[in-house]
Amino acid sequence: MPYINRVLGPESLGKVEYANSIINYFILLSAIGIPVYGIRQIAKIREDSDLLSKTTVELLCILFITTLSTYILLFFITILGSQFHNYTDLIILMSSMLLLNNLGAEWFFQGIEDQLYITVRYVVVRIITLVLLFILVKAPSDYMMYALIVVLNTVGSNFLNFIKIKNYIKRKHLNFSVLNLKQHIRPTFTIFLASISVSIYLQIDTFLLGYMAGDQYVGYYSVANKLLRYVILFITTIGSVLLPRLSNFWVNDKNMYFSYLQKSFFYFLIISLPASVYFYFFSEEIILLMAGEMFKNSIITLKILSPICFLVAMAYFFGFLILYPQHKERIYSFSVLISAIVCLGLNLLLMNKYQQNGSASAQLVAEFLGVFFMVFFIVKKKMMSNFNLDISNLLKILISVGILIILNILLKYFLYTQKNILGFVISTISFFMVYFFLLFLFKENTIIGVLQSLKKILPTKKNDLLK
């Protein structure tokens, strides 16, 4: 990311991000909620190979129809919309993500929990695209090459998915007469409503910034937003891994469901809270060292966005790990729909005066409202009556974060900190070392559990080596 920020600059980077935001809307439109619905359904029936094959083919057929329809719609909008003419080449190139995203069936492999395949494939594709990035992108004029690499990085691995999924589908005993596409329409549409609402407050800011303020402000906003999204991606990946297992437990073992739910809550909290604090206090160093002086306008933007790490973690916990497994996606849809409407209104109100900072503020409010409404309905409907939160463990995490905040205030305002790469690396390592030391000192359950697991593994490997 630092390399791309410095080579492309705000304007060229903004062009690619603007086109990407447009394509992401069409991806959501064509997917109609199947990526989330598919994970849940596949997780529930993965032991029944015949039903697994039938359900997978049904969902792929729906996706084929919606993808074709979306391409037709995209073609007409690109041709007729004069504001898109300067981005036609980028939109055509990046539209390949529509096909690869939908027919790659990532939801299938998440549903069967083939984590080894997902991880290896992810790492290989990331390494290839990183190498291509340094070889092909050398100047601001290379933004088309960068767009191609974004496509490969985002959905390149889906080539392999399309080949591998054939091994799981029993085609001999499957014909179109037994397929029932209609049964999936209503639940996918409910999830689709939530997905499109979330996308409004994730993508509308970029779209409106490009339309109302210009590519430069999109660049400023994208740098701050992308830095956060790397951490958020880690959080959402944990959520994606846990969703199929919790969906399975909700059907087969309620006690295990609530046990895993409590562990998941503390995992999310341990990661997201210090991340939000870190981005707030280190925003200047992060932007200047990762993007350069030309992106200094992104510093305030990153500060505003920093609490989103925590809010997204809570949204995933309440939405994906409680509401979705319990088939209460309507509550999630309503919550994010209200948030999206508020986000759109705030963007229109704040963007002209505050540009990217107005968009950041709108997104922050939207994320908060989404979590607030989810918690309100979950408590009201007593959906967590069997969830016994360990208050003492929660206090250990909150106290550790509180001490971390106080230490950073003292360091920032009373001591001089060097703003160079070495100082940044040392400060970052020290920040997280102090945090995890505090958790260990207070004997926080999650950290102690991880250390005990490592302790069991290491002696075993040592003994194996001695044999």
Each model region followed by its residue ranges:
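Membrane-interface helix-capping segments at transmembrane helix termini in multi-pass transporters
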Residues: 8-19, 45-57, 68-99, 139-147, ...
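Short runs within selected transmembrane alpha-helices of multi-pass transporters and secretion channels
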Residues: 1, 19-23, 27, 31-39, ...
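Membrane-proximal transmembrane or re-entrant/amphipathic helices at the cytosolic face
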Residues: 409-467
